[in-house]
């Protein structure tokens, strides 16, 4: 059973990594394509992306705030959201939307 779970986890991680590569470039994440995904997949890709950058990975409450601010706001909105983890996990981050990209910048520590 443990072997099956390991294989499923590996497959899941590969799926997220492949989706991430399709939705990202050096500027950030492609906002329009990201917004077409369901909440769960979008959340996992954002978490993967931030982790790859060495930034804090949002908990579920923070992820809901990201989703509300960026993906449920009016079309022309350009929100900026700053967060960090209380546990000090990785660097804090500022998320913003610019030129159809979701952009992350590490907070100075």
How should these model regions be labeled?
Residues 1-109:
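AMP-forming adenylation/ATP pyrophosphatase catalytic core
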């Amino acid at each position: 059973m443990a072997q099956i779970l390991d294989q499923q986890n590996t497959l899941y991680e590969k799926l997220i990594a492949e989706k991430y590569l399709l939705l990202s470039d050096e500027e950030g994440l492609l906002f329009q394509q990201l917004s077409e995904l369901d909440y769960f997949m979008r959340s996992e890709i954002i978490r993967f992306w931030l982790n790859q950058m060495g930034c804090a990975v949002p908990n579920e409450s923070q992820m809901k705030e990201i989703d509300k601010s960026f993906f449920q706001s009016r079309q022309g909105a350009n929100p900026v959201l700053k967060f960090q983890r209380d546990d000090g996990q990785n660097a804090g981050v500022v998320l913003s939307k610019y030129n159809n990209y979701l952009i992350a910048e590490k907070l100075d520590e």
